[in-house]
């Protein structure tokens, strides 16, 4: 009897919480319309205006114009924004950054695309493949192939039944960040 008395209020509360399904979607009606093309254009221009390093031809890590710290792997994601913008608009201002960036990150990274972290090289390789697909310039594909050769060196089966290590010094660390992008390459 005690169980029944406990269940009745619980069931009443549960059924009371079930209301009109329309309540769930009341925000879909929206107060304004978003122009996604304009939003994409604005963000693509902003990444150049706020993060592009005119002197070094790479993307700064911060947008303040003072911190010109270079981080290898975010370069790929920033360039992917410009690739998407170019595909969408065919505006030459985006394509003009491709070759500059290619040379800039190589120079800033010590004259090489090699990096101690396999996942970092994977992101750059994926971007190089996209650059090749958009421009048909062999240098991008050749660089992606060179990166892939370095990345494959990270494979070992001694730990975790196989996979690509996170970095050259931690062969036992098999993270999703170093194996997921490799699967895409």
Language-model features: where?
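Low-complexity, Ser/Thr/Pro/Gly-enriched N-terminal "stalk/linker" regions
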Residues: 18-111, 134, 138-161
């Amino acid at each position: 009897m005690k169980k029944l008395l406990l269940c009745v209020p619980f069931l009443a509360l549960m059924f009371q919480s079930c209301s009109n399904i329309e309540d769930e979607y009341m925000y879909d009606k929206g107060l304004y319309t978003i122009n996604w093309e304009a939003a994409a254009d604005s963000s693509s221009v902003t990444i150049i205006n706020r993060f592009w390093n005119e002197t070094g031809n790479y993307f700064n890590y911060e947008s303040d114009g003072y911190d010109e710290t270079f981080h290898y792997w975010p370069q790929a994601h920033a360039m992917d924004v410009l690739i998407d913008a170019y595909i969408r608009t065919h505006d030459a201002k985006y394509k003009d950054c491709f070759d500059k960036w290619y040379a800039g990150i190589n120079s800033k990274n010590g004259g090489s695309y090699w990096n101690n972290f396999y996942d970092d090289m994977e992101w750059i390789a994926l971007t190089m493949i996209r650059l090749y697909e958009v421009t048909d310039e062999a240098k991008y594909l050749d660089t992606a192939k060179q990166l892939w050769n370095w990345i494959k060196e990270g494979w070992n089966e001694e730990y975790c039944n196989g996979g690509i290590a996170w970095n050259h010094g931690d062969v036992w660390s098999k993270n999703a960040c170093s194996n997921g992008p490799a699967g895409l390459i």
